[in-house]
Structure formats: C-alpha cells, structure tokens
Design a protein with these regions (language model features):
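Outer-membrane beta-barrel proteins
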Residues: 2-12, 18-205
Length: 205
C-alpha cells in the first residue's frame, strides 16, 4: 500500500514537472531551518518549494530543505484534496512522503487530515504509517498582530511558535520565536537565547 502511495506522489510531481504546470515556486533563506520545532540546519539554511493547485481541489507539492547532520537535504512530497463545506469551512485529506537526501536517514509516510475555519485557524492531524508516530497541530492568526502555532509529534515532542511576517522587496520577511519541550532553560534564559529566534526571507515566482 505504501509503495502505491509513494509511486502516486512521484507520478504526480513528475507530471507537473514535465508539463511545466507548477503554479508556484518559492525559494527562501533563514537563520535556521526548523521542522516541527527542531532546528535541522543548525545555522543558516535554505529551502525550495514547488506546488500546484488544480481547480477541482487536488493539489501537490515538493519541498526541499537544507540540513546539517546525517543528510544534506530533507525532502517532503505531498498530494491532497481540499473541499469547501461553506464560505468559512474547508476540510482536507492528503498523503506525504518524507525522505533524507545525501544520507542514510530513514524516511517515513503520513496520511493527513485538516479542517480550517476562515478567520479562526487550522487544525491538522497526521497519521504516521507503519511505525511512524502521529502528530496534531493547530495554527491561528486570531491574535491579529502575530501568528501562533502549536504541535505535538509522537516522534519529536511538542513545540510552539509565535511569528510575524511582512511583505518586503517583492517577497516576505518572517521573524519568530520557537520553543521545544526539549529546551530545559528557564523562561528568562529562553528570551535571551538567540537560538530560539529566527528570521527568514522568501520569494515567490
């Protein structure tokens, strides 16, 4: 079953690549690359993200992030389907394949489910396949001036992030603070530790 889903993801990505149908390509650089609360670049990192949304609700995308450690890059390939229940409510399902490029790390696969309410936020649940852990997360811009997100991953612990984005030079600048449960520093030390803060710039083509 997993091999069928993997092949579907790759076929979807190859189809769009061959047709030149990617509607959006984003490139970015950040003081640190974070994935689910974990700093995977241990310093300046970059990412490339290509995606496409079809008119019938189907979508697909591939994201590549630089990393430091046992691999050169971390890649996420995803396909999914979104459906609007109303003007405010959207539900979605999808499949994701995560892999490590240039190293020996083992990847994993997930089924994804989400519900979003316009003006309130999004709740996402990811079911790990085989022996992979599950994850749920919530994100919201309800605080008006900043975005807030929280996630809890069986294989990686819990984290929260607060961030703010601005349009600049044709792209977007994002600054934020992220804290993971593995960080044992007291609150005062966390606020003075620059490792907990990040700044990045991304540009969409």
């Amino acid at each position: 079953m997993n091999s069928i889903l993997k092949n579907s993801v790759m076929a979807f990505a190859l189809m769009f690549t061959s047709l030149g149908a990617f509607a959006g390509v984003q490139v970015g650089v950040s003081s640190d690359n974070y994935f689910r609360g974990h700093n995977i670049s241990d310093g300046v990192g970059y990412h490339v993200f290509a995606s496409h949304n079809l008119d019938n609700g189907l979508w697909g995308g591939v994201k590549l992030m630089s990393m430091d450690g046992d691999a050169d890059h971390f890649m996420a390939s995803m396909i999914g389907y979104d459906y609007n229940l109303s003007d405010k409510i959207e539900i979605g399902v999808g499949y994701a394949d995560y892999s490590f490029q240039g190293g020996d790390g083992d990847g994993w696969n997930e089924m994804m489910m989400s519900v979003s309410y316009d003006g309130l936020g999004s709740l996402r649940y990811r079911k790990g396949l085989d022996d992979a852990g599950d994850m749920w997360s919530f994100s919201t811009g309800l605080l008006k001036y900043v975005d807030l997100s929280y996630g809890d991953w069986d294989d990686g612990g819990s984290y929260f992030q607060i961030s703010k984005s601005w349009d600049m030079m044709g792209g977007s600048v994002k600054v934020g603070y992220i804290d993971h449960e593995d960080n044992d520093d007291d609150f005062a030390d966390k606020l003075t530790d620059f490792d907990n803060f990040f700044v990045g710039y991304s540009y969409n083509f």
